[in-house]
């Protein structure tokens, strides 16, 4: 009988601890990101260390995009506004350029300004080789980025990625159509 009670207590403790490990996100992905240091829209170094201790939302865009990047960026702006309205602090937004040769810091600054981006917590990143962003996106965000040899349009995913304070991707959401803004805000709050 004592053995059975001890087993039940142990099981309950394991379940409780495993739930804590998910940081309040059900079925958290826990994809750990590798360190990075790139260049932001202000031509300053910006990297994972700058995001340490903060929850952040990432996406992959480029300024020359003819279709999906415009609505994605508009949706990220909506998310930034909603987070501010909800009084959420310690939240950052990161847009990785998938066309770094074209997307200089100046070009990214102009692009973000067209959407009234608040650059105090929204960082548009460049300053890496095309191959590097393609590999980083695949290895750590499990998404494709591919610039064809001909043409100027880059193939890339359209998801938003929620990253926790330790640099782990916890969840992803559509960033294009019918974006679940309320769910993302709820999940951001659950991580804080």
Regions found by a protein language model. Name each.
Residues 122, 134, 141-146, 155-161:
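Structural micro-motif
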Residues 148-192:
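Thiol-/selenol-based redox modules, centered on thioredoxin-like
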Residues 1-9:
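Bacterial N-terminal signal peptides that target proteins for export
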Residues 33-34, 55-56, 157-159:
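Short loop/turn microsegments at loop-to-beta-strand junctions
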Residues 74-136:
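Structural microenvironment flanking redox-active thiols in thiol-disulfide oxidoreductases
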Residues 48-70, 76:
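Short active-site neighborhood of thiol/selenol oxidoreductases, capturing the structured segment around
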Residues 15-19:
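C-terminal motif of bacterial Sec signal peptides marking the signal peptidase cleavage site
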Residues 22-49, 74-75:
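N-terminal "domain-start" segment that seeds a small globular fold
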